[in-house]
Structures are given as C-alpha cells and as structure tokens.
C-alpha cells in the first residue's frame, strides 16, 4: 500500500487499525440530507357519501325576494370520487328577473394515482393551461400530473452546498440570518442536500465546528424559484371533449369537439421548457416557452404561440422577469398579439367581429404589468402595481394600485389600498382593520370611497364553524352616502 503514489500508511497496533492517508480526489463526496425529508404518507381510503348545501334568501324593497339552494353531492371510495354541483332558485315575490329552476354546474368522475401523481377526470372538466395560455370548460376526459397528491415531493430545484471536512464535524446552516438547522458530518468531501424550503435570493452561511470547538464559516449566495421544475421532472395534462356553453345558465349545452394539452420539462436546474397545443375542426394552435434562471439575478420567462382559426392566422408573444428577496420583489409581465390570433376561448363564439369589422370577442392587443413590493419590517409591507391593457380598437385601460399592510397586536392587522383609473382620473380608497376575537370569532371595520358609490362604512362580525360540528354565522351593517343603509345576517 505504501508504494502507491501520495498514499501514507500507518499501523496502530494497540487499536488493531490500519490508518491510510489518501489523496483528496480519491474520496467521493458524501451526499448528506441536511434535514429529515418529509415522510411520504400512505393514503387511507374510505367509502362514503356527503352532501354540502348552502341556503340563501333575501328580500329587497324594489325587486322583491328570492330563495336559492346550492348543493354538492359526492360519493367516494378507494377508486376515486363522483361529484355533482348545482343550485335551484325560486322567486318569492315581485319581479326579480332572476332565472328560476334548477341549474347544474359540474358532474365529475375523478380517479387518482398517488404513486405516479396523476389524475384521470371525466365529465365536466377544465383544461390545463400555462401562464401564457388560456383554459376552457369542456365536457370530456382529462389526464395529467397532479403533484398535490405527493406533498413529500419538492418539484423545484433547491440549492446544494459542498465542502470538505478533515475531522468529524457538525454543521449549522443560517439562511438570511436565521438558523435553519444542523447536521453531523464525517471526514471527507460532502454535499448537503434536502435543504429547508426557501424562495428568492439570499445568503446561506455554513458554520462548521470540529471536536476542539474550532469554527469556520462560509457564505454562499443562492437564488431559488418555484417557477422552475427540478432537472428531469415533467408536468403536463391533456383534455379531449366538447366545449361547454352557457355555463351557469344551461344544464347540458355543449359545443364543438376540441382538444388541449400542456407540457413542462425540467431540462436543467436553471432551464424549464414549456409547450402548449390546442385543436378543433377549424383551429390549430401551438406554442413553446422557456423559464430561465439568470444565476442570482432572477428569472426570465418567454413564450411564442402561433394559431390559425377559420382562415385567420396570428401570433402571441409573452415575456416577463421576476426577482425577489426577503426585503423586496419586482415582477413584470408583457404580452403582444396579432389581430388574427385565436384560441379555444374564442373558438365557440357566435361571431368575433361586428358589421364594421370591430372585435366583439377578442383578447387584448397589448398587456403590460409591473409590480414592486417592499418589506419594511416593523413598519409593514408596501406594494405598487401598474396594469395597462390596449384593445384592438385602441381602447386603453390603465390602473395604478398602491397598498400598505401591517400586523398590529396579536393577530390583528390593518390594510390600506388606493387605486387610480388613469383614463377617468378617479381614485378608489379603502381602509380595513381586522381584529380576531378568540379562536373562532373576528370583527372587521372597513371604510371605502369610490367614484360611483361614494363613501361607505362597514362593520362585520364573523363566527366560524367549529371543527367538531356546529354552526357558523355572520352579521354585517353598512352606511352608504349614495344608497340606503343595509343590515345582513347569515347562518350556516
């Protein structure tokens, strides 16, 4: 053994041990989970049925009264669940103008597979969509990934910290100044994985302590975002069926056949690929996008979609940027569309343009969103957002939103918001104070001032339903400058 290059051997006769010193590169890095991974739970299946319902009645001086009953019926066993929702409405007096009778919302059969984290759905379904595509209601079948079935899985890449220990060592991890935990290491190279869930930009400090109490600290910056998929992980769904028409008005009104599919794949820990397709008899749409982490500088997303619907072709371009820390965050999102762009959300419209070739139903031409938030510590949180939308007939909508919130004593909080319509030049202001009263009771005081309704003062008291059964109730009172005062009470 001593003849090997850079190897030193020493025999400990007392301990009957052969001690070897070998080159560092000979020792493979030991992967050490930093903290205990969330244990994968074994689902417990039962068999049964339930009925959820909500009864509501009201009476107004001018429009009369009405009563409505909403319901959810559900049957479940170890294979899945079957549910149906809807409501029945009855006009009690006067001419309220509301539709009477029964209206069905959704009837859905769902089968889940926790091992593969997938779900089969049949009946009334909603197609899967990405941040740059649209979802639609359909009657048909859907199959796709459902990570909510596996809460033990972390779908986005978490940082790994590597180093080397010469002697048995303990390691403490501090993230953004807070101690996140500790673990023990044996001599040799190491890689710490399974770190606590973190998001945004920050600094991690590794403090190693040997048996003699000597400490060495190493600072390592990181940027984590849940928008990415971990390398090798995929996500997606496919939906086939007929487009749902007049949802919430007609019970069984379905239109032409259509299909939709979305897919995401984590190519690397800093690059996630996305794709989306839609199709019908006179519609073909396809799009591709990326989410890229720029090291510690944030995340950029982009996507391009091309469509052809009833002979019209068009494109859609989306892009954005996000950056967040524990002190502030900034987000921008933008979209640009051609006039001929179409998708399933527009496909079943009776007509897209009027007799003057102006759009009746269309997506916006340009959309721009900017948001900025600051964490002021003991002084609360401040946020600002600007949204601009331009239609194909050059109509513009520009909104400015400002907000401030702060925790007060106990779990109480105060919230102040103001918004301005740039075209109208009007401000809307709201101030709200939330005060918890015990475990299940809370009170709220709200002051509002809007251009249309004037000033409004509201008092609200809420009692939530006990977990072991019972009733919940709510009482509200409001005084309005441009309308009659009102009182309201609910029992559930």
PLM region descriptions:
Residues 10-14, 280, 421, 450, ...:
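Acidic/polar residues at beta-strand termini and the immediately following turn/coil
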Residues 41-42, 67-78, 98-114, 255-269, ...:
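Feature captures outer-membrane beta-barrel proteins of Gram-negative bacteria and organelles
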Residues 51-60, 238-239, 444-450:
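Short strand-turn segments of transmembrane beta-barrel domains in outer membranes
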Residues 170-171, 248-250, 273, 299-301:
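Extended, compositionally simple hydrophobic/Ser/Thr-rich segments
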Residues 231-263, 456:
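Compositionally biased low-complexity segments at domain edges in trafficked proteins
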């Amino acid at each position: 053994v001593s003849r090997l290059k850079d190897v030193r051997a020493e025999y400990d006769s007392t301990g009957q041990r052969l001690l070897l010193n070998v080159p560092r590169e000979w020792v493979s890095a030991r992967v050490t989970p930093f903290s205990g991974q969330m244990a994968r739970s074994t689902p417990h299946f039962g068999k049964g049925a339930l009925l959820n319902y909500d009864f509501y009645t009201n009476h107004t001086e001018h429009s009369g009264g009405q009563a409505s009953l909403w319901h959810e019926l559900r049957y479940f066993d170890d294979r899945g669940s079957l549910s149906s929702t809807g409501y029945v409405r009855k006009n009690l007096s006067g001419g309220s103008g509301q539709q009477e009778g029964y209206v069905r919302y959704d009837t859905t059969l769902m089968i889940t597979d926790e091992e593969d984290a997938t779900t089969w759905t049949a009946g009334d379904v909603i197609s899967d969509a990405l941040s740059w595509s649209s979802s639609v209601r359909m009657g048909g079948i859907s199959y796709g990934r459902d990570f909510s079935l596996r809460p033990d899985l972390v779908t986005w890449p978490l940082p790994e910290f590597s180093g080397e220990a010469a002697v048995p060592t303990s390691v403490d991890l501090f993230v953004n100044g807070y101690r996140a935990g500790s673990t023990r290491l044996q001599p040799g190279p190491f890689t710490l994985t399974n770190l606590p869930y973190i998001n945004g930009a920050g600094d991690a400090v590794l403090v190693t302590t040997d048996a003699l109490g000597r400490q060495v600290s190493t600072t390592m910056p990181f940027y984590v975002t849940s928008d990415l998929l971990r390398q090798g992980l995929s996500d997606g769904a496919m939906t086939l069926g007929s487009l749902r028409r007049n949802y919430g008005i007609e019970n069984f009104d379905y239109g032409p056949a259509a299909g939709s599919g979305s897919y995401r794949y984590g190519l690397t820990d800093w690059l996630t690929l996305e794709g989306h397709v839609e199709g019908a008899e006179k519609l073909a749409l396809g799009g591709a996008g990326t989410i890229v982490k720029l090291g510690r500088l944030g995340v950029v997303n982009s996507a391009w979609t091309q469509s052809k619907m009833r002979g019209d072709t068009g494109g859609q371009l989306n892009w954005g940027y996000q950056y967040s820390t524990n002190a502030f965050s900034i987000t921008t999102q933008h979209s640009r569309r051609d006039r001929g762009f179409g998708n399933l959300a527009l496909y079943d419209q009776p007509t897209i343009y009027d007799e003057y070739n102006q759009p009746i139903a269309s997506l916006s031409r340009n959309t721009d969103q900017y948001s900025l938030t600051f964490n002021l510590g003991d002084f609360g949180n401040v946020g600002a957002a600007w949204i601009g939308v331009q239609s194909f007939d050059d109509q513009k909508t520009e909104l400015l939103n400002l907000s401030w919130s702060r925790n007060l004593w106990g779990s109480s909080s105060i919230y102040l918001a103001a918004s301005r319509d740039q075209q109208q030049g009007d401000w809307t202001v709201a101030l709200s104070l939330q005060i918890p009263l015990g475990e299940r009771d809370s009170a709220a005081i709200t002051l509002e001032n809007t251009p249309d309704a004037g000033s409004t003062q509201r008092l609200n008291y809420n009692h939530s339903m006990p977990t072991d059964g019972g009733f919940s109730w709510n009482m509200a009172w409001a005084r309005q400058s441009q309308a009659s005062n009102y009182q309201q009470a609910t029992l559930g």
